[in-house]
């Protein structure tokens, strides 16, 4: 029995896919029987490094603006769908999970004349184009937010997160986390986390916060490409400002902080699962207004404050206000927290796949 997972492109698709793969293995599926497909981007590094079989496809995503490359897209998708069909036959695939993005469409098309069920997982409060299209013949769509617009046959389970966060205990990890980062015990800690697309702007926010000489420590995950320059600025700052390029033990980052300033992609599931209040700066990049939809959904519960990229001067005041309300905001995260999402999806896939 093989389960095929189509998750590619950005970390917002790749890491939830990996979380489901790890949950399947935890439930007894042999790792060689959890096969990932994608392009030659982040997924081509992440899945093999985690020990999973990975089969690259020659494909590309749709550009939202008029671009000559879009003219070739139908032929590219057809070729990729034929490649997926061969994988389905050669591997005796029992069920397929697509996590949106450009790889989901050829995977879904390959199933249209086969008795193999398709499941989808949507990471955002507003469904992406690929999942909206593929949901027309999916058995079920697992959503990260309740009442996700644009999808039929949806079931709210939450966004799959890493195993290290699914049983997160801040009080138990806090002393280890503070020692890990070298953080003093006498101040609150504000985490500033920039993803691959948002790092430059979030790093400017970290600089802005440091310039206010705050009564808190800044823990800045700057991204590998920005870490050296941020560390240089932090060394010259008069405020406590700790810089890391990347943190493999992400549970220690969340355990160390009292508040996160970050983007609002699918990673918001990590904020709610770890009961971390947030000041969210939604990005305007990518497909549609997904980050704004996510940010509004979290803010509606009282777990986050939201500010646009055009109003970054408001961030220090919002951080001050959020720290003063952090107990109430942390409690509000429970409204959306679904730390068992990866296991729930894995169990549903196994039930469908049968013995």
Feature roles, as predicted:
Residues 66-95, 113:
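An amphipathic, basic-hydrophobic alpha-helix
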Residues 327-339:
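A short, well-ordered alpha-helix in the C-terminal region of glycosyltransferases
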Residues 321-324, 338-355:
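C-terminal alpha-helical cap of glycosyltransferases
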Residues 3-8, 30-76, 157, 308-310:
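Conserved nucleotide-sugar phosphate-binding/catalytic loop shared by glycosyltransferases and other
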Residues 44-46, 173-179, 183-259, 292-295, ...:
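Donor-nucleotide binding loops and adjacent catalytic segments primarily
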Residues 301, 306-327:
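C-terminal "capping" alpha-helix adjacent to the active site of nucleotide-linked donor transferases
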Residues 35, 112-175, 180-183:
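Active-site-proximal region of nucleotide-activated glycan assembly enzymes
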Residues 93-95, 247, 255-268, 276-277:
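Acidic donor-binding loop of glycosyltransferase active sites
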């Amino acid at each position: 029995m093989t389960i095929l997972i189509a998750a590619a492109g950005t970390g917002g698709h790749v890491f939830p896919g990996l979380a489901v793969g790890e949950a399947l293995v935890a439930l007894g599926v042999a790792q060689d029987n959890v096969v990932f497909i994608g392009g030659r981007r982040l997924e081509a590094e992440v899945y093999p490094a985690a020990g999973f079989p990975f089969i690259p496809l020659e494909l590309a995503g749709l550009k939202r603006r008029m671009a000559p490359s879009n003219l070739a897209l139908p032929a590219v998708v057809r070729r990729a769908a034929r490649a997926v069909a061969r994988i389905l036959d050669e591997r005796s695939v029992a069920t397929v999970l697509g996590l949106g993005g450009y790889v989901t469409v050829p995977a879904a098309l390959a199933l249209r004349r086969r008795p193999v069920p398709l499941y989808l997982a949507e990471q955002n409060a507003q469904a992406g184009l690929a999942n909206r299209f593929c949901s027309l013949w999916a058995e079920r769509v697992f959503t990260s937010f309740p009442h996700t617009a644009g999808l039929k046959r949806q079931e709210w389970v939450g966004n799959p997160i890493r195993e290290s966060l699914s049983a997160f205990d801040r009080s138990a990890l806090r002393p280890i986390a503070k020692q890990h980062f070298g953080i003093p015990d006498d101040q609150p800690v504000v985490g500033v986390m920039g993803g691959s697309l948002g790092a430059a702007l979030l790093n400017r926010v970290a600089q802005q916060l440091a310039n206010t000489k705050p009564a808190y420590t800044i823990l800045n995950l700057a991204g590998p490409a920005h870490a050296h320059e941020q560390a240089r600025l932090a060394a010259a700052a008069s405020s406590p400002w700790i810089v890391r390029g990347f943190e493999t033990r992400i549970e220690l980052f969340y355990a160390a902080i009292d508040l996160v300033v970050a983007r609002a992609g699918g990673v918001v599931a990590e904020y709610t699962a770890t009961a971390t209040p947030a000041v969210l700066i939604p990005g305007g990049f990518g497909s549609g207004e997904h980050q704004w939809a996510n940010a509004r959904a979290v803010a509606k519960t009282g777990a986050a404050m939201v500010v646009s990229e055009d109003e970054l001067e408001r961030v220090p005041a919002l951080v001050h206000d959020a720290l003063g309300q952090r107990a109430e905001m942390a409690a509000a995260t429970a409204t959306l927290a679904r730390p068992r999402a990866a296991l729930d999806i894995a169990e549903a896939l196994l039930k469908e796949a049968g013995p």
